[in-house]
Amino acid sequence: MKISPFFIRKEEYMRFVHIGDVHFDVAFSTISSRADFGEERRLEQRRGFKQAIDFVKEHHVEYLFISGDLYEAENIRKSTIDFINNLFKEIPDTKIFIAPGNHDPKTKNSYYNNYNWVQNVTIFGEEVTKIEFDDVDIYGYGFEDFEMRDYQLNDIFVSNKMKNTILITHGDLYNNTIYNPISADVIKAKGFGYAAIAHIHKRDDYYPGSLVSLGFDEPGEHGFIYGELNNKQLKKEFIKVEQKEFVTEKVDVSSMASNEEVIEALNKIDTKNDFFEIYLVGYRDFEISINMRLIQKNIIKVKDKSKFKVDLTENDTTIRGIFIKLLNEKLKSGEITEERFQRILELGLTSLGK
């Protein structure tokens, strides 16, 4: 991971890395039924976090900001906390700040309150705290429960607007939710040189996005932000973390004649070592039943969105024709959904021998 300083002289700027939404020990159970998938992805979370810490160490970055949802409070294991803390020990000269989020609030019994973190770690609570250094003033606050609606940002007074100032918190910039709703306009009005925020897993001007993708709704590259701040002049860049990505593709089954052909087609897909979700589309006249054990490992989810092929003339008075006609009437009246229609149609025609 190579970088070039944006400013000419070191004394002109302060440097930081901003990480958000790691979600250590998240279950991943809704993504794939494969027993080993969750453990594999949790190992990737560890590798991704280590890449970020190695970057900090290699480039002697002075500040590390972790803007909440570092871990999943419901599932977190002490061994994972030990892993995190041991990595922090590798960067003793870096000042580390954590603003707990709605998934890892600083509750009475949390690891944030009941663990011997290394000395260079500061963990914010729900009250805004200001910490002053020669090169920057840092204002931070975080969750102490699974909800926060106190609008604490409005009450922050930036005392020295001529100095580098940074806000660290976990919150929602785009919706008036129970997860610390905050305003981009207020952030700008306060005069912060940088706002280290997390909560939204998609990267944009404020959010770094999740460090490692957590599912098919988070496609593309993931990583963290490296930044340099000098008297309100901000330079930043996205640093990609090497990981398997989540990819969604469609497979048209219209030209296929059997379930076995579908399985063969799935096994020919070049997954490039990424995780794939496949949508089966098109029209078919055979029943689909995919045994996940028969397809390549990196295809972790297959959804059948194909439709059963129906060839029916208006004067078809057979049991088959009457069945389809009645089913069509239920669909048109809104009594059943398209998905339900397709399922009943397939089961019915299979029973009738098509």
Give names to the regions the model predicted.
Residues I3-I81, L347, K354:
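N-terminal active-site segment of His-dependent metallophosphoesterases
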Residues F37-L43, D135-D145, K244-A257:
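Acidic/glycine-enriched edge-of-secondary-structure segments
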Residues E58-H60, N160-K161, I269-T271:
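Glycine-rich phosphate-binding loop signature in dinucleotide/nucleotide-binding domains
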Residues H60, D137, G191, K272-D274, ...:
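Short loop/turn motifs at secondary-structure junctions
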Residues Y63, E72-G223:
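His/Asp/Glu-rich metal-coordinating catalytic cores
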Residues A198-M256:
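A conserved active-site cap/scaffold subdomain adjacent to cofactor or substrate pockets
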Residues L234-K354:
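Accessory, non-catalytic peripheral segments of nucleic-acid enzymes
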